[in-house]
């Protein structure tokens, strides 16, 4: 099954929950332990003191990975100067597992789409390889979150790719290739305003408003019809009603 066959509303709900995940990552960026726990403990312990940079929805050629977490290692024994994690997030209504990925057609389609996204995004960096630059460890990760409560059901961390890249150039590339609309949403400090803005961004707010308006209109039109019926009965000629009643009585 292709994800293009999903109802439009399901895609919009998925986009909305992606934004919630991004906001949570930003709130945990300064706390390595909590950020690592939220993402499935994918970062090794020796990166606990590393500086962390986060990028969202970075356009890399034909692909846009959901999130890139870049950690600058301060461990003298670490062969890599930088550890770069490419994340692809999938959200589901029910619980997802590796078994459901094999048997649930939607979960399977999400998983395969995520793999293609990660592979092509990381391969895009190959055009920027520089022989005498520092070593990077580029790691692809796919995470399945339950939409209710943003619970991480399961994740898959794949083997890292070793690349020699320029830190300043790649950081600049990531920063300027982010989605501007997403950055504006994530900059909203108040959570209630953020949630409402996300609903508007994904068109969910408009749908909810239209649904509510339709309900109100239906109720109002029903009330108007009832009022009109009562008014007709009220305005009916009373003499005519009485004469009709007398005729019926004589016939009996």
Swiss-Prot record:
Annotated localization: Virion; Host cytoplasm; Host nucleus, Host nucleolus; Host Golgi apparatus
Q: Which residues form the signal peptide?
A: none
Alphabetical keyword list: Host cytoplasm, Host Golgi apparatus, Host nucleus, Late protein, Virion
Q: Which residues form a coiled coil?
A: none
Q: Which GO terms describe its cellular component?
A: host cell Golgi apparatus; host cell nucleolus; virion component
Biased segments, Polar residues type: 212-223
Q: Which residue ranges are recorded for the region named Disordered?
A: 211-252
Induction (free text):
Expressed late in the infection cycle.
Superkingdom of the organism of origin:
Viruses
Basic residues bias spans: 237-252
Carries keyword Nucleotidyltransferase? no
Q: Which family does it belong to?
A: Belongs to the herpesviridae UL24 family.
Main function: May participate in nuclear egress of viral particles. Plays a role in the dispersal of several host nucleolar proteins including NCL/nucleolin and NPM1. Since deletion of host NCL/nucleolin negatively impact on nuclear egress, UL24 supposedly acts on this process through its effect on host nucleoli.
What's the protein called, per UniProt? Protein UL24 homolog
> Which species is listed as the source?
Human herpesvirus 6B (strain Z29) (HHV-6 variant B)
What lineage does the source organism belong to?
Viruses, Duplodnaviria, Heunggongvirae, Peploviricota, Herviviricetes
Q: Which gene encodes it?
A: U49
């Amino acid at each position: 099954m292709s994800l293009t066959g999903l109802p439009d509303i399901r895609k919009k709900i998925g986009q909305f929950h992606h934004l919630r995940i991004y906001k949570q990552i930003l709130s945990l960026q300064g706390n390595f332990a909590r950020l690592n726990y939220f993402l499935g403990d994918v970062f090794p312990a020796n990166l606990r003191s590393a500086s962390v940079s986060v990028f969202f929805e970075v356009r890399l050629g034909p692909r846009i990975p959901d999130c890139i977490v870049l950690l600058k290692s301060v461990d003298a024994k670490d062969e890599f100067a930088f550890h770069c994690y490419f994340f692809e997030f999938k959200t589901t209504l029910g619980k997802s597992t590796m078994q459901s990925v094999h048997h649930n057609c939607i979960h399977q389609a999400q998983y395969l789409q995520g793999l293609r996204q990660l592979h092509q995004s990381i391969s895009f960096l190959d055009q920027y390889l520089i022989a005498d630059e520092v070593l990077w460890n580029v790691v692809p990760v796919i995470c399945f979150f339950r939409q209710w409560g943003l619970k991480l059901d399961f994740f898959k961390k794949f083997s890292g790719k070793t690349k020699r890249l320029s830190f300043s150039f790649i950081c600049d590339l990531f920063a300027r290739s982010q989605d501007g609309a997403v950055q504006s949403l994530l900059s909203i400090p108040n959570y209630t305003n953020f949630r409402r803005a996300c609903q508007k961004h994904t068109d969910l707010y408009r749908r909810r408003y239209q649904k509510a308006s339709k309900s109100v209109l239906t109720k109002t039109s029903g009330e108007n019809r009832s009022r009109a019926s009562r008014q007709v009965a009220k305005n009916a000629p009373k003499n005519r009603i009485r004469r009709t009643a007398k005729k019926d009585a004589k016939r009996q």
